[in-house]
Amino acid sequence: MPAIISIVDVAKTYATGFQALKQVNLDIRRGEIFALLGPNGAGKTTLINVVCGIVRASAGKVSVDGHDNVTAWRAARALIGLVPQELTTDAFETVWATVSFSRGLFGYGPNPGHIEKVLKALSLWDKRNNKIMTLSGGMKRRVLIAKALSHEPRILFLDEPTAGVDVELRRDMWQLVRDLRETGVTIILTTHYIEEAEEMADRIGVISKGELILVEEKAELMRKLGRKQLTLQLHHKLQDIPAA
């Protein structure tokens, strides 16, 4: 089965000279949950923004379900839902209005039935007429997910989806991601937490200083992480192993 996202030799260098991405190559399988693991500043968000067409790569190529994200950007972007890390919403709009408006931005006509389905799936239906400024941080994050799903994308990017949320809401988010995958949505999430990647992902990629240094099936990576090794560096060569 061909990859739904193909990233080939992608690099990004900003005008300051900072190289955020270095020759990244990655294929995302259709229908999988892929976790991109790395510390702050590793390049996770930059890579997402390049794939989504928000940031232009300095080199390389990205295709989304066969559509080049530069020459066929509209078709590529229509397949993608993006949930940013920051809680960026219109505080004075209602939940229903902001989710419906997001659908229209992608050129889709009104579909109250779909919006209702999304809001109910995210436990937002009883908040549909509430202004976003009245919602908790966890509910605002759910609104961002609803906006990302408003135009029925086949790919969903979640940038640090559980950042700043409590343990209970984090587990609710994990279940939501699993439920979305069951509907056929391909999911790519970024995280700092190995336990989050272990809980949800089919495959895990590790990025550091702009380089994708590892891509593994989750089970294989967990097996490797389970092995412990201690290395001692000696100042002088030992002739014999000391007695205990």
What is the meaning of each model-derived region?
Residues G60-T71, A75-A76:
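Conserved ABC transporter NBD signature motif
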Residues L156-D159:
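Catalytic Walker B motif of ABC-type/P-loop ATPase nucleotide-binding domains
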Residues W174-A244:
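ABC transporter nucleotide-binding domain
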Residues M1-I7, A11-Q23, W73:
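A short, flexible loop at the N-terminus of ABC-type nucleotide-binding domains that lies
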Residues S100, G104-K127:
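Conserved ABC ATPase "signature" region
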Residues S150-R154:
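A short, proline-enriched helix->beta-strand linker immediately N-terminal to the Walker B motif
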Residues C52:
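Helix-to-loop junction immediately C-terminal to a conserved catalytic motif
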